[in-house]
Amino acid sequence: MPSSSDTALGGGGGLSWAEKKLEERRKRRRFLSPQQPPLLLPLLQPQLLQPPPPPPPLLFLAAPGTAAAAAAAAAASSSCFSPGPPLEVKRLARGKRRAGGRQKRRRGPRAGQEAEKRRVFSLPQPQQDGGGGASSGGGVTPLVEYEDVSSQSEQGLLLGGASAATAATAAGGTGGSGGSPASSSGTQRRGEGSERRPRRDRRSSSGRSKDRHREHRRRDGQRGGGEASKSRSRHGHGGEERAEAGKSGSSSSSGGRRKSASATSSSSSSRKDRDPKAHRSRTKSSKEPPSAYKEPPKAYREDKTEPKAYRRRQRSLSPLGGRDDSPVSHRASQSLRNRKSPSPAGGGSSPYSRRLARSPSPYSRRRSPSYSRHSSYERGGDVSPSPYSSSSWRRSRSPYSPVIRRSAKSRSRSPYSSRHSRSRSRHRLSRSRSRHSSISPSTLTLKSSLAAELNKNKKARAAEAARAAEAAKAAEAAKAAEAAAKAAKAASTSTPTKGNTETGASASQTNHVKDVKKLKTEHAPSPSSGGTLKNDKAKTKPPLQVTKVDNNLIVDKATKKAVVVGKESKSAATKEEPVSLKEKTKPLTPSIGAKEKEQHVALVTSTLPPLPLPPMLPEDKDADSLRGNISVKAVKKEVEKKLRCLLADLPLPPELPGGDDLSKSPEEKKTATQLHNKRRPKICGPRFGEIKEKDIDWGKRCVDKFDIIGIIGEGTYGQVYKARDKDTGEMVALKKVRLDNEKEGFPITAIREIKILRQLTHQSIINMKEIVTDKEDALDFKKDKGAFYLVFEYMDHDLMGLLESGLVHFNENHIKSFMRQLMEGLDYCHKKNFLHRDIKCSNILLNNRGQIKLADFGLARLYSSEESRPYTNKVITLWYRPPELLLGEERYTPAIDVWSCGCILGELFTKKPIFQANQELAQLELISRICGSPCPAVWPDVIKLPYFNTMKPKKQYRRKLREEFVFIPAAALDLFDYMLALDPSKRCTAEQALQCEFLRDVEPSKMPPPDLPLWQDCHELWSKKRRRQKQMGMTDDVSTVKAPRKDLSLGMDDSRTSTPQSVLPSSQLKPQGNSNAAPVKTGPGQQLNHSELAILLNLLQSKTSVNMADFVQVLNIKVNSETQQQLNKINLPAGILATGEKQTDPSTPQQESSKPLGGIQPSQNMQPKVEPDAAQAAVQSAFAVLLTQLIKAQQSKQKDVLLEERENGSGHEAPLQLRPPPEPATPASGQDDLIQHQDMRLLELTPEPDRPRILPPDQRPPEPPEPPPVTEEDLDYRTENQHVPTTSSSLTDPHAGVKAALLQLLAQHQPQDDPKRESGIDYQAGDTYVPSSDYKDNFGSSSFSSAPYVSNDGLGSASAPPLERRSFMGNSDIQSLDNYSTTSSHSGGPPQPSAFSESFPSSVAGYGDIYLNTGPMLFSGDKDHRFEYSHGPIAVLANSSDPSTGPESTHPLPAKMHNYNYGGSLQETPGGHGLMHGQTWTSPAQGPGYSQGYRGHISTSAGRGRGRGLPY
């Protein structure tokens, strides 16, 4: 019967697959469609009810029929035996047993169950059938019927016929171990391919038998719940044996074997093998069926419920009986049969191979995919490779969706656990379960491209393994048969031939590895693998599966060692194997690669040496098989053999916690299981030695290794953070690379940056230390869309932040050092053929040691001069973009970077970007005005550029660069001119720049660093926030503080007191030098009477925190709603209030002293300015009044108070007081310097104390935690003149701090009050900084507003103040400030400058400076001040030289000139002051600082004020 059915179904051993398929399809059509319905229902029922006995009669009944009838009958009988037979019938009909097997797997657990039942029953059947071919053949039909409806529907009857036959042959390894004549590898491949076809075929056929299948599934699901589990246990044993046999058959890949062997040697060998097996199986059927039913249910139940179930199943492989004897013997007989059949028939035991091949071939096929083994073992061997499992999953899911089980076990790993649970449920419910399980991994695998590739590799590997197995089968077949016989006899465990074993092992090992992973996850809960193994033994099915794997391993062992030790050793191996497989699989699965194998080997080896027991060999084999699946199977087999030997030495892996890093102790496994559940999916992590590399597999370090301190920047693909390395305590910058919104994975800019920075190693180029992630696990990373972090060395500042802050003044030597380092780094890049393409001030980093580093290589690219390919011209920030890019050049050269560096050189001198436009056309226009219009006369190739005709300037300009930047030192100007050549071919190179006179002999290492703000890291982001806050009219305390550095005290205080005074801050910065003029201001106008002053003091003292709005109310100051809101946000800290009295008083004393000094008040007012900008205007007015009276009343107190406040660190006042130490050289200059000092102190002290008084620290943007220490330079520059006046004032008044703030406000307010209001309007219009009209009016409006640069409003409106200024000498200063802000203002002032510095004491100068500062305070950076740089009158410089002498007295006017602008040009021309005003582009606060410096009297403040505010 079997042979006839096989022949009929298979079309004869010699028939080609296509022919066999056709025949099988025809037969199926004829017999399956009519017979299947009755057979399926009755077969299923009998199978469930009478597992062993009914099948034989049915088989016999099936046998008598014609080949087709026999096939149908066999299907019926086998179906009676188990759900499997129908599949076998299909296989016979299709002649595609492998495909059938795969289809069965796909079809679901039922298919597997049926196969198992067939196996279990076919064991007895062999004798009954004699060949068992009929049973296997018959089994095909039920398989079709039992297959999921989806699978059936998918497989048409036609497709189902051929592919089902193929599947039947494949699945029913017994029914013609080779469904096709093709070699096992070919069969397996076909099986895989055919399995897919069969899926469709079966789907179509199942479409016909959908109802039947559904009914059968339902019945199976119900009965199969119990019986199916029994049959599964049988299947688990017999099925696994079949699977092994199928593996052997498929691996032997002798289709003839399956067919002819099934017919001939099948009957003989199968009878021989089956006889022992039959007796055993009969015993099992009578005894085992119940136990199988009992045990399989347990295994299934336990497996379903617990991971242990898998282990139990594995164990139950050996336990299959108490069935160890019967199952083991069964297995042994099966393995012997498999081995025998392979050797005799060359195809393996045909009947057994059919049975074994049927279930085994499905298994092997399923396993061949690499998921199959594990899944098949755990799921009764039905688990098919991922491909199959996917189809079976779907099918079984739709009818019997074992989703519940799947979900239950999916926990371990959705794919693996689901496989197990699904395979179990599907064993019961449908054959597809094995496929199901495979599918779950495959689906999971397929979810990622990596998984898909791995899946492909698995299939290819399985095919290769099958081929290798086939090749080895012939040689090993005999050995395997003998070894199998010996092993079967000795161990009474069925082991497939080594070829089969290895083919199946390799294929199923992959599956097994995955299954093992599942098992690990599931088993992990059990503390000891041994216990788990015992449980597995208790569960027959898993043991069967495990036994298969073990048998495969054992077969290899047998081949190597001849025979494994006994059933005990086998069972031990099985137990160990599942455990080690589980353990190893976890790591192996992740590391399904050579590393895994090596690691496993190493781990196992390390563990093995102490463990001499050979039983471990199966595990090793499995591990090896897994590894083999991964690597070349021949190599894998050898490795596996070696591992096996090592494993044989190893005792139970569970007991050996150290045995495997990969396979840890059960408890460790549990943890590992959980960890591995996460780690297994680690797609990104190293796949090898997952456990071994636990700590390093996902990356040695995670972002958790850093303490993130704050954000310091925003890049193109994420934020930049300042962080501290927890291990080394080193400061680093973390550049975040977010993958969230990245459509194409990792950002190309980040890839380029990483790639390029790894090739650039230079002291002037930022160093990338490492790359870390924000996830410790690849699974989490994939799930949550993690981020990468590029770890760079930390740099304290960038040039943009420093220039805009106004806190630093760079002299010519500093600029030389910076440019030397910059050009060295750029020359290095260009010599390495890299273009940076994004050089700008914010990408030039600076640390506190004065080291310059080029950063942000996200736009950089490799450059090839020989290469003519075009590059994008949309590179380089617009302000630094060279004319060739603006005109559309795409074949540019490194000259583009040199242009950017030339822009930076000019910016270092002018303190502001030299070409500021917001559109390309406007940018080109600006360049043309300074550098001349691009024309063929100067730039012959310009006519070739794409946009030359469309973008050329409307009018022709001549080159005026040297005239515009005449204030730059000659050597620097030469280089500047050379670097800004329009024609890129005439532009200097980085190397030539290093050889120019300006940079030739510069040694940056020997040059002292500039006086950098150690209390504040000045970065672009900080600077932008600061500027934004000022524009919003809010006090940017931090910014103010920094600005104060530029502004020194005034800028800081202004910002703090009322950012609205943003103008004031600028003026404050200047006023530091000009603060002398401020006192007069305070006088005018709003002076608080004693009662008002008392109220103010009481207010300050009485409240723990004072709201600026309250201040305004108390002072009866009118404020607009916007300013009011800003003021409401501003609270003075209790500390400030505590010193509030002092502050208020000191302010008054300061004001008083300032008034006498004439320059102190402005500085003091400036200091109050540090308060919120919005509040500043209002507060300034209020303070102006308060300070006026306070100053009058308490000049002497002021000095004391200021000193006290300095000590107390109370706000603006204290810093001012600190400044006092340097006493004014002259009342005017002294006051001016003192004011500057006070401003400095305010900046330094104010950051903490003053600001708190004026603004709560929380409201201030980043500020130095402590007030910046007073720098001698700054103090001297700003305070020399101011020293004495401020000191005495502040010392005298206990409220000096408050008074200083008030004085500053008053100084601004009063001067602003008279002219202020005029100017205030302008200021308000021009600048958002001005919250209060007073402040705005004062000077702020014009100087702060961008207008200052552009408009004379500040000065014009200040023109009224200039009167005051003149009286204070502030007029000249104002003009100088105005020069910064506007040329017109200078015009008024230039005559006065001399008078200003001379006739007007520092106070006047200070006031003027305040005005000037206010101007610079304007964010000139917001405007294009390039063309206004000539505004500044030289007179201001000259004037300022006197007053500025205080601050700059230390630095002669020349030094001032060195202050970049005015050093050369401020004195020389108003342009210098204009430049100084331009400085304000950086920020109002900055402007003031520089403005003071730029003012002649305060060179430091002027330098700072001009920093960027310098017009040019």
From Swiss-Prot:
Q: Which residues carry this modification: Phosphoserine?
A: 316, 318, 326, 341, 343, 359, 361, 384, 396, 398, 401, 438, 440, 526, 1049
Gene Ontology MF: a single term? protein serine kinase activity
Which residues carry out catalysis? 838
Modification N6-acetyllysine occurs at? 557
Sequence ranges of Gly residues compositional bias: 129-140
Q: Where is the composition biased (Basic residues)?
A: 92-109, 210-220, 419-436
Summarize where ATP binds, as residue positions: 712-720, 735
InterPro entries in UniProt: CDK, Kinase-like_dom_sf, Prot_kinase_dom, Protein_kinase_ATP_BS, Ser/Thr_kinase_AS
Entry's localization field:
Nucleus speckle
How the protein assembles, per its UniProt entry? Interacts with CCNK, CCNL1 and CCNL2. Interacts with C1QBP.
Tell me the keywords, alphabetical order: Acetylation, ATP-binding, Isopeptide bond, Kinase, mRNA processing, mRNA splicing, Nucleotide-binding, Nucleus, Phosphoprotein, Serine/threonine-protein kinase, Transferase, Ubl conjugation
**Gene3D superfamilies given in the database record:** Phosphorylase Kinase, domain 1, Transferase(Phosphotransferase) domain 1
Report the record's Gene Ontology biological process terms. alternative mRNA splicing, via spliceosome; hemopoiesis; positive regulation of transcription by RNA polymerase II; positive regulation of transcription elongation by RNA polymerase II
- Any one Pfam family here would be Pkinase
Keyword ATP-binding attributed: yes
- The name of this protein is Cyclin-dependent kinase 13
CDD domains assigned to the protein according to its UniProt record, in alphabetical order: STKc_CDK12 (cd07864)
Role played: Cyclin-dependent kinase which displays CTD kinase activity and is required for RNA splicing. Has CTD kinase activity by hyperphosphorylating the C-terminal heptapeptide repeat domain (CTD) of the largest RNA polymerase II subunit RPB1, thereby acting as a key regulator of transcription elongation. Required for RNA splicing, probably by phosphorylating SRSF1/SF2. Required during hematopoiesis.
Q: Which residue stretches belong to region Disordered?
A: 1-60, 75-547, 567-597, 655-677, 1026-1085, 1139-1173, 1201-1231, 1245-1273, 1309-1334, 1353-1400, 1483-1512
Phosphothreonine carried by residues? 589, 872, 1059, 1246
Q: Which organism is it from?
A: Bos taurus (Bovine)
List all disulphide bridges recorded for this chain. Answer: none
Could you tell me where the Pro residues compositional bias lies? 49-58, 1254-1270
